[in-house]
A protein has these predicted regions:
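Hydrophobic transmembrane helix segments
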Residues: 19-31
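Juxtamembrane boundary at the C-terminal end of a transmembrane helix
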Residues: 117-128
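Juxtamembrane loop-transmembrane helix junctions in multi-pass integral membrane proteins
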Residues: 1-4, 31-40, 59-69, 93-103
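Transmembrane alpha-helical segments of integral membrane proteins
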Residues: 79-95
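Hydrophobic transmembrane alpha-helical segments in integral membrane proteins
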Residues: 1-14
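Core segments of alpha-helical transmembrane spans in multipass integral membrane proteins
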Residues: 11-21, 37-62, 75-83
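Individual transmembrane alpha-helices with interfacial aromatic-anchor signatures
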Residues: 99-113
Length: 128
């Protein structure tokens, strides 16, 4: 688990750079301005959480369930949030919007919020 978390963080980071470049160059002509902004939001959130996963992976000892749950929230939440945005944007650009992905984005966002809340709780619990 200790090496898996920074590995996933690095993978998410690498994919964020690839998707960001793809969006900025290849999709700029295909996407509307709103679709491009949505796609960029997915890329930004993916990169933020990729960096966070690398940092947590090297700083957590994974001796508690709380640390494990925090990391799972960020891994799963990032995947659901960002990749559902990519799917929505790409499908809409092709004229076939995958409506099933619509509810997945806020679920991913909620899981990210839970991860941040658990991380905050872990800091407060250490102080108290």
């Amino acid at each position: 688990m200790i090496l898996l978390v920074p590995f996933i963080g690095a993978l998410y980071g690498m994919l964020a750079v690839i998707f960001g470049a793809f969006g900025a160059h290849a999709l700029k002509k295909t996407f509307s301005e709103d679709q491009l902004k949505s796609f960029e939001t997915g890329v930004k959130y993916q990169m933020y959480h990729a960096i966070l996963l690398v940092v947590l992976g090297f700083n957590f000892g994974f001796n508690s369930f709380l640390e494990t749950y925090i990391v799972y929230c960020f891994i799963i939440g990032t995947f659901l949030f960002s990749f559902s945005i990519y799917g929505l944007c790409l499908s809409a650009a092709k004229g076939k919007k995958l409506r099933i992905l619509g509810p997945i984005t806020p679920i991913g966002g909620l899981i990210l919020v839970i991860g941040w809340g658990l991380l905050l709780y872990s800091f407060v619990a250490e102080v108290i």
